[in-house]
């Protein structure tokens, strides 16, 4: 997007406009997503409790009930308890919402639809989502209420404890993929359903369930919602909030639910990739125009959204099915079960990846082809070479050299390539058995 704006305005202004457009789009995604998820939770709760749920506002299914509730909250009076810290009391809900919102900056909705592609996107999301607890603590501290303070203290202890096993679970797919870039991890899982990392080995399968348990606790959802236990703390840390500020806490909660579900979809369930292989939309973009590329990204986004909504629905189902735990039981689940299991899964994934890099399916994973994605003129050139080779047209020495150079670049990126080198694949001027010039240049650079 910055490249598009740079055609008409200076470079610094182009990047600023691109950042503003991304912020506006992401804010609407979080806000609209929260409205949809609130309506969905009401319908799920009604279904589990043998009720109908919203049925009056917006037709038979109550589509506009959440919007009506939002308008009601906007028109409500903003109250503040006597003795509260005015600055911190007003600031707390915005801190929680901003922390939840920032997680979407590095979350890819499709192969080409991501605000910022970060090399450490996994840990960026975990770091910014960990900041949400500061808003909860400030809300409890500044409300001048013992119920709010108890809720904030519970949330702090719970989030800090569950981030340890959750971080270890996230490292397992990162270790297998060899990258912390979420886009690269998603590209690695292209192809059939068996290429998804959850089916790589038994350890990743168990790791997903430990991750999802810890993620449910980190976003303060039942049965781990001790910070807002109605039977003990009235309403928890947001007891004294009303109106629009109260709604910011709920938008942050549902936004975090979608974010952790999206992270699980990328790390374990193929991200935007479907269960069946589809065409290489990047190659179609260069051969048939950008319309096919946009169509591919849109289909990938639909796959990603379906997986995220499935994860959010599972959290809602757990809330209305399982009873709330006591605070000592919540900490026991973390320290006695989740943390040791996550540590064992991490060690098991290390050993499995070292001795059996093919994974549980037995299929060789072409890391070099998946992690290396050519673009621009190089992608078009390699596409033409593939078409010529598939049609039986013999490739010249220059064509084979071009293909071998691209594979060498993929090896330098940390990928694997077990294809043997022959005399025709060497660059011109190299001696038999000597390292290519790119290898010598890389060694001298280091």
PLM features: residue spans?
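Selective transmembrane helix interface/packing segments
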Residues: 1-389, 393-422, 426-446
């Amino acid at each position: 997007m910055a490249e598009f704006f740079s055609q008409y305005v200076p470079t610094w202004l182009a990047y600023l406009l691109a950042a503003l457009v991304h912020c506006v789009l992401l804010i609407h995604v979080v806000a609209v997503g929260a409205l949809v998820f609130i309506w969905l939770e009401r319908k799920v709760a009604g279904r589990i409790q043998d009720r109908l749920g919203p049925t009056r506002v917006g037709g038979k299914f109550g589509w506009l009930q959440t919007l009506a509730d939002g308008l009601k909250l906007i028109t409500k009076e903003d109250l503040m308890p006597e003795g509260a810290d005015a600055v911190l009391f007003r600031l707390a809900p915005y801190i929680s919402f901003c922390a939840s919102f920032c997680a979407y900056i590095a979350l890819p909705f499709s192969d080409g639809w991501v605000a910022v592609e970060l090399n450490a996107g996994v840990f960026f999301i975990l770091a910014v989502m960990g900041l949400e607890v500061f808003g909860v603590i400030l809300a409890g501290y500044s409300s001048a209420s013992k119920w709010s303070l108890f809720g904030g203290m519970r949330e702090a202890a719970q989030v800090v404890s569950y981030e340890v096993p959750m971080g270890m679970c996230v490292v397992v797919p990162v270790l297998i993929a060899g990258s912390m870039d979420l886009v690269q991890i998603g590209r690695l899982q292209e192809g059939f359903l068996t290429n998804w990392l959850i089916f790589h080995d038994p350890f990743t399968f168990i790791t997903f369930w430990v991750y999802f348990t810890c993620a449910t606790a980190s976003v303060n959802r039942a049965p781990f919602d001790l910070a807002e236990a109605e039977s003990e703390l009235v309403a928890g840390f947001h007891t004294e909030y009303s109106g629009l500020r109260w709604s910011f806490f709920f938008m942050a909660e549902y936004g975090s639910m979608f974010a952790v579900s999206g992270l699980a979809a990328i790390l374990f369930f193929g991200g935007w990739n479907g269960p069946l292989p589809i065409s290489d939309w990047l190659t179609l973009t260069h051969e048939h125009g950008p319309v096919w590329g946009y169509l591919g990204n849109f289909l990938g986004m639909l796959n990603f959204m379906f997986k995220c909504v499935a994860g959010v629905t599972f959290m809602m189902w757990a809330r209305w099915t399982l009873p709330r735990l006591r605070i000592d039981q919540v900490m026991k689940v973390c320290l006695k079960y989740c943390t040791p299991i996550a540590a064992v899964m991490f060690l098991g994934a290390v050993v499995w990846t070292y001795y059996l890099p093919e994974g549980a399916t037995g299929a060789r994973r072409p890391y070099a082809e998946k992690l290396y994605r050519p673009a621009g003129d190089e992608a078009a050139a390699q596409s033409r070479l593939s078409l010529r080779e598939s049609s039986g047209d013999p490739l010249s020495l220059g064509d084979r050299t071009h293909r071998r150079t691209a594979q060498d670049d993929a090896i330098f990126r940390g990928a694997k390539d077990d294809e043997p080198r022959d005399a025709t694949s060497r660059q011109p001027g190299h001696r038999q058995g000597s390292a290519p010039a790119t290898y010598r240049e890389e060694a001298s650079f280091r």
